[in-house]
């Protein structure tokens, strides 16, 4: 018998069957940051479109937030750990140059070591690639063993003192990937644009640092180029293999990676204009006589004007997490899906959605998905609604306290004192935290539980 000749029934509608979101309890207000940094009023809140920024103290790292969100996913949806055959982590937040975050998550799967997958890294794009990889894995493997996959996208985004510090954030999202999913991803229509750029990177330097090197203008132009190229490739692929798509009009929600929400608005404007050029149609009845250039300020402003209705209906309403948490890196794109699922618009009929994923360096992709009225969709929607409400349960810190917290992270990272113990700061209930680093730099974690099982969501100090 040849193993390659085994026959089985293919699976359909592979995609997201369950979702959980974690974000830290700490946040700082962007209005306060404007005053603290002595910049003009509205520079962060209007110019960048940001309201608040979440951040982690030195007692949370990439492993702790990944443990937290994965455990929440398993418990919320009562997932059997024996049903998982693949676990992939998308992150650019590194605490080890060799050992993957995924290996630490194996502690949550006692008795099941047959779980494929490791970490995937390329700036903010690693999460999208992890999702696509898991979809491929389930498509191939589920017919044989009936096993599903889990994808974790998580990052802690912080910047050194200066103009970019206001664009940080932190968060983690976990997905269950399975057949007959509530949010299937039509992976066969994904299209990508890859290129060697130096718009944002984190070199290994003599002095340990969590901070990236950023070329702001190159980052913007690279992002907009990626939108144009991926959308062009996507429409070309769709037109070659199917009929009936009417560009962006075919989608009820359009989600783009969000370094900050004004960047999303610019990206959508380029996508909308590219859509018009490809279909040779006027936008909102306002045609343009000449080709617009996204790298020209006036041209981009015109694109934004022409895309106002699409922005209002398909993208802007779903940026609540991005505005109030900031740039979570890999989760930033998928936080918009959660906000969309919390809205009343998705409760009737099948909906079509579109994702644009981007990671500096650069890697980018567009892929479509659908929201189906399955038996599990209501559970997912309740998780999304609770996550939005949990934004109001966070603790506000002053800019001075925020700055001190980042200094604590620097001290913890660079201190030669071994073993190390981070400071004690507030956490949401049922959150893992970094407890200790021993003389071999091995990190240990503890689950912070609410006393007596009470979960008030208001945070306590442990």
Swiss-Prot record:
Changes seen on gene knockout: RNAi-mediated knockdown results in sterility, slow development, reduced body size, severe paralysis and reduced pharyngeal pumping.
Catalytic activity: acetoacetyl-CoA + acetyl-CoA + H2O = (3S)-3-hydroxy-3-methylglutaryl-CoA + CoA + H(+)
Pathway listed: Metabolic intermediate biosynthesis; (R)-mevalonate biosynthesis; (R)-mevalonate from acetyl-CoA: step 2/3
Documented EC number(s): 2.3.3.10
Disulfide bonds: none
Cross-link annotation Glycyl lysine isopeptide (Lys-Gly) (interchain with G-Cter in SUMO), location: 408
Electron transport found in the keyword field: no
The entry's keywords: Isopeptide bond, Lipid biosynthesis, Lipid metabolism, Steroid biosynthesis, Steroid metabolism, Sterol biosynthesis, Sterol metabolism, Transferase, Ubl conjugation
Catalytic residues (positions): 92 (proton donor/acceptor), 124 (acyl-thioester intermediate), 257 (proton donor/acceptor)
Residues that bind (3S)-3-hydroxy-3-methylglutaryl-CoA: 124, 167, 219, 257, 266, 327, 360
Gene3D superfamilies, per database record: 3.40.47.10
Group of enzyme by EC: transferase
InterPro entries on file: HMG_CoA_synt_AS (IPR000590), HMG_CoA_synt_C_dom (IPR013746), HMG_CoA_synth_N (IPR013528), HMG_CoA_synthase_euk (IPR010122), Thiolase-like (IPR016039)
Function, in words: This enzyme condenses acetyl-CoA with acetoacetyl-CoA to form HMG-CoA, which is the substrate for HMG-CoA reductase.
Entry-linked NCBIfam families: HMG-CoA-S_euk
Name assigned to this protein: Hydroxymethylglutaryl-CoA synthase
The encoding gene: hmgs-1
